[in-house]
Amino acid sequence: VEWTQQERSIIAGFIANLNYEDIGPKALARCLIVYPWTQRYFGAYGDLSTPDAIKGNAKIAAHGVKVLHGLDRAVKNMDNINEAYSELSVLHSDKLHVDPDNFRILGDCLTVVIAANLGDAFTVETQCAFQKFLAVVVFALGRKYH
């Protein structure tokens, strides 16, 4: 993937200004609520029986923050995102057995939450760069699947 200087600038600034403790939990909770089959990977996280239980689940919130912080790795390695996510891809494939399509689903939920929070500040240019960035991250996370 080739990045323009404008895309690099948008991504770096955009990610750095996200409120991880707000956006991460909301995005993961939305994913688990809207796509309930994704809950199967979170059986050890406690009560996921209702949308309110999911939204109020501290383990889900903490994992949402962790996932969002995981994007920092891609920002720091934009010229080699595939390599930066190699170990995470193996972990999700070989140990956790996560369906790789769920990475795209979570990215979609993340985009919805960010757009809702930023409103007009989530410009077309920002979304364009962010969607490209997420597509590369999703590809990298699914790369080690066999």
Swiss-Prot record:
Residues 2-146 form the Globin domain. InterPro entries: Globin, Globin-like_sf, Globin/Proto, Hemoglobin_b, Hemoglobin_oxygen_transport. SUPFAM superfamilies: Globin-like. GO terms for cellular component: blood microparticle; haptoglobin-hemoglobin complex; hemoglobin complex. Keywords: Heme, Iron, Metal-binding, Oxygen transport, Transport. Disulfide bonds: none annotated. This is Hemoglobin subunit beta. CDD domains: Hb-beta-like. Red blood cells. Heterotetramer of two alpha chains and two beta chains. Coiled coil: none annotated. It comes from Thunnus thynnus. GO terms for biological process: hydrogen peroxide catabolic process. GO terms for molecular function: haptoglobin binding; heme binding; metal ion binding; organic acid binding; oxygen binding; oxygen carrier activity; peroxidase activity.
